[in-house]
Swiss-Prot record:
It comes from the Eukaryota. GO terms for molecular function: sterol 3-beta-glucosyltransferase activity; UDP-glycosyltransferase activity. It catalyses: a sterol + UDP-alpha-D-glucose = a sterol 3-beta-D-glucoside + UDP + H(+); ergosterol + UDP-alpha-D-glucose = ergosteryl 3-beta-D-glucoside + UDP + H(+). Gene3D superfamilies: Glycogen Phosphorylase B, Pleckstrin-homology domain (PH domain)/Phosphotyrosine-binding domain (PTB). One of its GO terms (cellular component) is phagophore assembly site membrane. Residues 285-384 form the PH domain. Sterol glycosyltransferase responsible for the glycosylation of ergosterol to form ergosterol-glucoside. UDP-alpha-D-glucose binds at S911, R912, D914, A1214, H1216, H1229, G1233, T1234, D1253, Q1254. The lineage of its organism: Eukaryota, Fungi, Dikarya, Ascomycota, Pezizomycotina. The GRAM and PH domains are required for the localization of ATG26 to the preautophagosomal structure (PAS) and are involved in autophagy. This is Sterol 3-beta-glucosyltransferase.
Length: 1405
């Protein structure tokens, strides 16, 4: 084994080892493996092989361990099922648009500029900049990189994220216009793209320089602030960008009203009216989920889906248990409105609603009108949040710009008035703001009315003047009007820039727009200018013409947001990327700053020029309005009547629509010619590359790394488009950076060819086969492990993704290199995500995003406190605590604890490990005031009663069955012969004794291995729960614990193992159980379908951190946590054991525990010798519990005991909770209780499974990375496992983390609360079973004839045990109840008088 350079490389190389080693491929050696631990000649020998020649798993026998149910387990473990495919995802028949893709400008991406087509100023700018290209370095093989230099961790490892290339000049500035990513299709003409990019960079540099100079001038002009100015005035000046502090006249707590309330503060100063609201951080949990009907794009039929509103995306799924494969999504970041539909009938509220985005309108139908309202409200909240990427909302407008104020009553308990404000002196666009006051509304209205009237004469004279003065004050005021600052905590210059520039909800640093005529063309009634020029102003007349519905998002981008896509910003000029999408090839001769305004039906080309040195480029652009009106010459007079202007605009509206349609048709007619001219051969190469397969890695700027194979230079130049298309495909935020892509097959029902995307936090897949729409979005935090497997098809190479609580995913690659590279990349990202989560970096990063807004909010409160004092502030603070639009929909937990004490019986059979969890549970029930009782084997009675728990005996000691297994081997001919003679009587005794032990019970909790509980609960008419230590409920996530395959087989195999096991086990005992039901319980014969055991409430007593709850588990199945019985606190260790541990610590040696229980092997001496040699070879100290020496295998080959060296100390017994807390690693057989104890102690666990559920828990330990599962036990394998478990820092840290999580759980308390919560549901099932059984309460023979009894037995009532609530179920229950009463009336009176002792009749429930 070659030496490794560091920990990460060692793990990766171990993972990618082509040779299948005896240790799992999911583990990596922590450091250089000593030469003594190399494989020897015994590497393929298993010294735990049982006696006899009967083969089973891997050619060896399996053993009964801990549970009676092991006899049936061999059926599952020997079964061979090959159904390994999942169902294909459903589709609603919609087809997605594929607009044109465009080039993007990113930081670190080189851009070639054709300077011949630019003006001299542009050429000089572009020549000065040059081509700046970030030095990405040589990537080499991906798995060679260490964690420290991984791109996910670089922001945390270094303060400098981007460094300039020393070979070039200044680094190219970042161009990040407000944008929307589009899907992958051809891009526009490269020449025009480069022209626009060069102009955009030039404008950005110029505006940055001007802003800096302006900021310096303003600072110098202001000088020091007046010390007499109040802190509140100073704070408002900084927050809203005023020229000087303005005295605060009055302030009110109010709400900005649109379709919802945004609560904040109104500050009235000498010159402005300001509104400020602090927004809480967006939640990452699902806001709302449930079933809805969705209409297709072209198909008017509604299809039912499961919808989940989480973050900014509304996703819908064909199967609610398969949440990694959405059928589609609605990206609400581009949402415009959410509103209810028109009622179809008078007097009935509508159930339909629609969501309008910039792309299309989605139509939904809820099950009720109330549900539709709730969905609309939730969607409106999300749309509002998505338009506010910052943590605060600010509005300020000069008092001189207010036209009027009028009352607008909305509700009786609040005062609402409307303020109309002129947006701009150039355009006369008018905005309306509604403010609602719950207190002091009349006072605020009168105050503002007087203030506005005082300014009315001044406002009129200003607007009627030929040309207003463009003083710095007026320019500054005009720029600050009605601007929303969505980012807080920045410098004042930055705040001014964000106010004057675009502040749309997609103005993020690296989000690039890709617009096309197909996407710009809207079916709704928005302006046709959107097809080629984005309008940014609005008016009241315009709203009345378009009749657009307002929504909460209107308050962000003013009223014109509903006549234009919200993805466009508020820039005075369109960005280069928008402009490029609006032009075609014959427009390349124009300057990139050319605009098209349709005012009189003609196109007017106007160049943006910088007129003089005193006017900045941005201010020059501000003089020209891009609104839907006439193009005005700056020297002409403006009309003094806004109403006349609005009428003119209304009249020109048809001409605008016609001109826009002509532009749209002209652009589309030349689109194909542009594609063929610029991308003639590129598409052939890309399509061929797609089917050939391969991989690509992307750098910091999401450009293709230079050392990837088959990289097209043009792809490198356009590399940042990959990340944008990736985010557009899966509706991911701009912060999700693309890292690598692969072409592979996803195995579900059939192999589905597509593309794998690996990003910082997500693993995504998208099908590329025409006619398929499968998408997968899998968070990396949900991935437990990644393993290599053989492909399902010859010549292909498999990769298995193991997911928490979900079935495995199978991918096939054409080449092993691509598969290995994908495995390495995923492992690196898993390590990075794990590192960031453990170190708290993710939380810190998220917290930093809101720190600035919180600080600003706190400083504002402090300033208010300073000015007004505590008494004046208290009413305002109290009202500000209410956030009606951000309320938490989750209700508080209700206490379901029953008022009376319950008699609870716990029925279980098996070994000590089966009884111990019930003792812990009953101790918790005793503390709750209940009267528990354990019904199990008589040998455990002293142990149970020692804890103050009542006891009832159950026959059928499993020792007899264990003896049969030991003496005959599992499922040999002699075993079947003896079991057929003795096992039937064993079951009869078990059933009869269990029926007697469960009398006088109000609730029955049973292990499924006891077999009798569900029938006893039906006879007693009492609620029934199940509890077990291993998975027993049908799921696609895990196989049955007794049917774990050698290799991953997929969800279909996992599910069918439960179906097979249930049927095999029931068939074996059905005859005896039905006979017992008739003779002793007085019940009819039943079947597996009639019992419906999968509807029974189930409690699993293992940790959800060890076995996460599968996504397809129903609500009544709960994983509660381990039920530990802590007995170690009262145990005193022997002196020899304490001295052995103390001596090992002094010597600096690791201590391991080895104990396999009472197993039977063919050569116990050889096994003992193997353990001794492995311990010595690994150089550890061992505490040994040698159970296999108690019962030798072949008496003829008996050998003397092997003497133990001083490094090994043998014990007979010790409490696990005490012993495992004093060791460094544990080695055992993998029983449920022992595994839980070692994991709780936080020590690495080595499992050598022998039988049944031990294979399942061994695989879980390995998947979690906290231990090793050995398939064979020999010196080579065992010594290496011991050394790795005691030296692997990765494994030790993971085990400690898992142990801390398990110790923080309270499984008993959780189980008791689950019992309380599901008790009413269990009572409902008990009532339905009693009705369906149609028997009296006494187990007395019926008076019916044999023919009548047989007829009743043939009744198919498998659908009768369903939920109560639907009309059909109610009718069915009524008929069954009537039939039961009729049957009871036919019985003799003496039968009705008899009842089982302790039964209280049908009213017990």
């Amino acid at each position: 084994m070659r030496p490794f350079l560091d920990d990460a490389k060692r793990r990766v190389d171990r993972k990618l080892s082509a040779r299948r080693q005896s240790l799992s491929a999911s583990r990596f050696l922590p450091s250089a493996l000593p030469d003594r631990l190399k494989d020897n000649h015994d590497a393929q020998v298993d010294f735990t092989a049982p006696p006899g020649g009967s083969g089973s798993r891997e050619g060896h026998l399996q053993y009964m361990q801990q549970s009676i149910f092991g006899m049936i387990a061999a059926v599952g473990s020997r079964s061979d099922f090959h159904a390994r495919f999942d169902e294909s995802s459903d589709s609603d028949g919609e087809t997605g648009q594929r607009p044109r893709k465009e080039s993007s400008v990113r930081k670190g991406t080189s851009v070639s500029v054709n300077t011949s087509s630019l003006d001299p100023s542009q050429r000089s700018s572009s020549q000065t900049d040059g081509n700046s290209e970030k030095d990405l370095g040589t990537r080499g093989r991906r798995h060679r990189r260490t964690i420290s230099d991984h791109k996910l961790l670089r922001p945390f490892m270094s303060n400098s994220k981007h460094e300039p290339d020393p070979s070039t000049g200044d680094e190219m500035p970042t161009v990040s216009p407000p944008s929307r990513p589009r899907s992958a299709t051809p891009r526009a003409a490269p020449i025009l793209s480069r022209m626009v990019e060069a102009q955009a960079q030039f404008d950005l540099k110029a505006s940055s320089t001007e802003r800096s100079q302006s900021s310096l001038n303003e600072t110098g002009a202001k000088g020091p602030r007046d010390a007499s100015v109040s802190p509140l005035s100073t704070r408002l000046m900084d927050m809203f960008g005023f020229d000087k502090p303005e005295k605060v006249l009055v302030e009110y707590a109010c709400s900005l009203l649109q379709s919802m309330l945004l609560q904040g503060y109104m500050y009235v100063t000498e010159g402005h009216i300001c509104f400020y609201a602090y927004l809480p951080k967006k939640s990452t949990v699902a806001i709302k989920s449930g079933y809805l009907h969705k209409r297709g794009r072209k198909n008017p039929k509604y299809s039912r889906y499961w919808f989940s509103l989480k973050g900014d995306v509304l996703s819908y799924y064909a199967d609610p248990s398969n949440l990694y494969f959405p059928s589609g999504h609605v990206d609400l970041r581009y949402g415009i409105s959410a509103s209810l539909g028109d009622p179809k009938e008078k007097g009935r509220e509508p159930r339909d609603f629609q969501v309008t985005t910039d792309q299309r309108t989605y139509y939904f139908r809820a099950d009720s009108a109330m549900s539709a309202k709730e969905w609309v409200k939730a969607l409106q909240k999300v749309i509002f949040r998505t338009h506010n990427e910052g943590e605060s909302v600010k509005i300020s407008f000069p008092i001189e710009s207010i036209i009027d104020i009028e009352e607008s009553p909305m509700v009786d308990f609040a005062e609402t008035f409307k303020i109309r404000v002129i947006e701009d002196d150039d355009s006369y666009a008018i905005d309306e703001y509604f403010f609602t006051f719950f207190n002091s509304g009349r006072e605020a209205f009168e105050f503002l009315k007087i203030l506005i009237n005082d300014q009315s004469l001044k406002i009129s004279s200003q607007h009627l003047s030929p040309q207003p003065d463009r003083s710095p004050r007026s320019d500054r005021t005009r720029k600050s009007r009605n601007r929303w600052s969505l980012t807080s905590g920045t410098s004042r210059a930055e705040t001014q820039r964000k106010r004057s520039a675009s502040t749309s909800h997609m103005s993020l640093a690296h989000d690039i727009v890709k617009s096309s005529p197909a996407t710009r063309h809207q079916d709704s009634s928005d302006s046709i200018l959107n097809s080629f020029e984005q309008a940014t102003e609005s008016s009241a007349a315009w709203q009345s013409i378009t009749d657009a519905a307002e929504s909460a998002s209107q308050i962000l981008n003013r009223s014109d947001v509903f006549q234009s896509p919200t993805i466009y910003g508020l820039d005075r000029r369109p960005s280069g990327r928008e402009r490029r999408g609006r032009r075609n090839s014959d427009e390349t001769a124009r300057s990139p700053s050319t605009r098209v305004n349709v005012g009189t039906g003609q196109q007017i080309d106007e160049l943006d020029r910088r007129t003089d040195g005193n006017t900045s480029g941005r201010e020059a652009r501000d003089t020209t309005s891009e609104s839907d009106q006439y193009t005005q010459d700056p020297t002409k007079s403006f009309s003094g009547a806004p109403s006349l202007n609005e009428l003119v605009k209304a009249g020109v509206y048809p001409l605008q629509r016609a001109a826009g349609l002509a532009e749209y048709l002209r652009t589309r007619s030349k689109q194909m010619s542009n594609l063929l001219a610029s991308e003639s051969m590129g598409y052939i190469e890309k399509v061929s590359g797609m089917w050939t397969g391969g991989r690509k890695h992307y750098g910091e700027a999401e450009d293709v790394l230079p050392d990837d194979q088959d990289v097209d230079p043009e792809d490198k130049e356009d590399g940042c488009n990959y990340g944008d298309r990736f985010r557009a495909h899966f509706a991911l935020p701009p912060t999700e950076k693309l890292q690598a892509t692969y072409f592979a097959y996803l195995h579900r029902v059939l192999p589905l060819y597509g593309k794998i995307y690996v990003s910082q936090k997500k693993l995504c897949f998208r099908s590329l086969i025409p006619g398929t729409r499968t998408k997968m979005i899998l968070p990396l935090r949900d991935i437990e492990n990644v393993e290599k497997e053989k492909g399902f098809r010859f010549g292909y190479h498999g990769l298995v993704i193991i997911i928490r609580g979900h079935e495995e995913l199978f991918f096939e690659f054409r080449t092993s290199d691509a598969r290995d590279d994908c495995a390495v990349t995923l492992h690196q990202h898993l390590e990075a995500v794990k590192f960031m989560a453990e170190s708290g970096l993710l939380a810190e990063q998220e917290q930093n995003e809101s720190e600035a807004a919180m600080t600003e909010h706190r400083m504002l409160q402090e300033a208010r406190y300073y000015d007004y004092g505590e008494n004046d502030l208290r009413p305002l603070n109290e009202s500000s605590e209410l956030h009606p639009i951000f309320d938490d929909p989750r209700a508080s937990i209700v206490n379901f604890k029953p008022a009376e004490s319950l008699r609870i019986t716990c029925l279980t059979i098996g070994s000590r490990g089966d009884v111990q969890p019930y003792i812990a549970l009953c101790k918790g029930l005793l503390a709750e005031g209940h009267r528990p009782k354990i019904a199990t084997h008589a040998e455990f009675e002293p142990w149970v009663r020692k804890h103050g728990i009542d006891f009832a005996p159950v026959e059928g000691d499993p020792a007899e069955l264990m003896r049969i297994c030991v003496e005959n081997g599992m499922f040999t001919y002699s075993f079947l012969k003896e079991a057929s003679q003795k096992f039937r009587g064993w079951i009869d005794d078990l059933l009869s004794s269990a029926w007697a032990s469960c009398q006088d019970s109000d609730l029955l909790i049973e292990s499924p291995s006891a077999m009798a509980g569900i029938h006893i609960a039906e006879a007693l008419r009492i609620p029934y729960f199940r509890a077990f230590t291993m998975p027993w409920s049908r799921t696609r996530a895990y196989p049955h614990a007794f049917a774990v395959p050698e290799h991953r087989m997929g969800g279909a195999y996992n599910y069918i193992t439960y179906v097979m096991f249930d049927n095999v086990f029931w068939k074996a005992i059905a005859g005896q159980v039905n006979r017992w039901r008739k003779n002793e319980l007085g019940l009819k014969a039943t079947t597996l379908d009639k019992m419906q055991p999968n509807k029974v409430p189930f409690l699993y007593n293992y940790s959800p951190s060890v076995v996460p709850p599968p996504l397809d588990y129903p609500d009544w199945i709960r994983i509660t946590g381990y039920w530990f019985l802590n007995e170690g606190s009262d145990w005193t260790p022997p002196t020899a054991l304490s001295e052995f541990i103390h001596r090992a610590r002094e010597d600096g040696k690791k201590i391991v525990y080895i104990g396999f229980g009472s197993i039977v092997v063919s050569d116990p001496s050889a096994l003992t010798k193997t353990v001794i040699e492995s311990v010595l070879k690994a150089d550890v100290r061992c505490i040994l519990s040698k159970g296999w020496s108690d019962r030798l295998g072949d008496p003829a080959s008996a050998k003397p005991e092997v003497p133990l060296p001083s490094e090994i100390h043998q014990i007979q017994a010790a409490p696990h909770d005490w012993l495992f807390s004093h060791i460094d690693a544990a080695v055992h057989h993998g029983g449920a209780g022992t595994t839980g104890a070692s994991l709780r102690a936080g020590v690495p666990t080595i499992i050598k499974p022998f039988f049944g559920d031990q294979f399942f828990f061994g695989s879980r330990v390995e998947d979690l990375g906290v231990g090793i599962c050995m398939k064979k036990l020999n010196v080579s394998v065992f010594s290496r496992a011991l050394w790795e478990a005691t030296h692997s820092e990765r494994m030790i840290i993971r085990a400690q983390d898992l142990g801390a999580r398990i110790r923080s759980e309270d499984g008993v308390a959780t189980a008791i609360q689950a019992i309380y919560r599901d008790l009413e549901y269990a009572k409902t099932l008990a009532r339905q079973r009693s009705i369906a059984s149609s028997t009296p309460f006494s187990p007395t023979p019926s008076a019916k004839t044999a023919a009548e009894q047989d007829a009743d037995d043939d009744v198919e009532d498998s659908e009768e045990w369903t939920f109560v609530g639907d009309d059909t179920d109610v009718e069915m229950s009524r008929r069954l109840r009537d039939r039961a009463i009729s049957d009871a009336d036919m019985l003799p009176d003496r039968l009705l008088a008899n009842s089982v002792p302790g039964d209280s009749g049908p009213g017990r429930n």
